[in-house]
């Protein structure tokens, strides 16, 4: 199965060490909102690999919230059924007030971007709640997202990418 080497380190620590790291973050950062890790879903791996990644996202979200750090649940999905699962999960957890999504990678491709925006809008309706969406990229579908969520915070990827590529804004 596929791995996300950069964020796999989180799981190399036992739960007590993860709780300690979250407590350190809470003390050092003060009032913040974090987004949970975006464990990738891949098309070329067994389906249960995706479901395992979604489970890890939910566990990481809970560990932050349980540790007193406000967290946006990252919605990573490949199928309509994945979005339905997330809607069911969120509907049963009133402590979920913020969700996150990123259009910076394959979800931001033309065609796929619009599909994800429509799925996110359907997700928001299915939860029956006023959720705040934190979204990275996706300015082209911002109107769809803004009409579906109570609030949207857009994190622009342009400045970051130009910095990485050492280009002027």
Tell me the role of every PLM-derived stretch.
Residues 1-24:
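Non-catalytic, usually N-terminal nucleic-acid engagement modules in DNA/RNA processing proteins
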Residues 1-6, 30-43, 99-105, 155-159:
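Short loop/turn segments at strand-loop or loop-helix junctions that form parts
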Residues 80-91, 110-123, 144-147:
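Distinct, well-ordered alpha-helical segments
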Residues 139, 144-169:
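C-terminal accessory extensions appended to soluble enzyme cores
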């Amino acid at each position: 199965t596929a791995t996300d080497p950069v964020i796999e380190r989180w799981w190399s620590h036992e739960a007590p060490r993860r709780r300690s790291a979250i407590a350190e973050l809470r003390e050092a950062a003060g009032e913040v909102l974090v987004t949970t890790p975006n464990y990738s879903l891949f098309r070329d791996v067994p389906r249960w690999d995706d479901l395992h990644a979604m489970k890890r996202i939910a566990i990481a979200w809970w560990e932050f919230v349980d540790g007193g750090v406000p967290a946006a649940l990252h919605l990573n999905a490949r199928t309509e059924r994945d979005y339905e699962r997330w809607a069911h999960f969120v509907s049963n957890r009133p402590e979920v007030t913020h969700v996150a999504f990123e259009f910076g990678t394959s979800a931001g491709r033309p065609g796929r971007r619009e599909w994800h925006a429509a799925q996110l809008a359907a997700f928001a309706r299915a939860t029956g709640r006023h959720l705040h969406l934190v979204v990275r990229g996706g300015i082209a579908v911002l109107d769809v997202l803004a009409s579906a969520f109570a609030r949207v915070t857009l994190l622009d990827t342009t400045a970051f990418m130009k910095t990485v590529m050492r280009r002027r804004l």
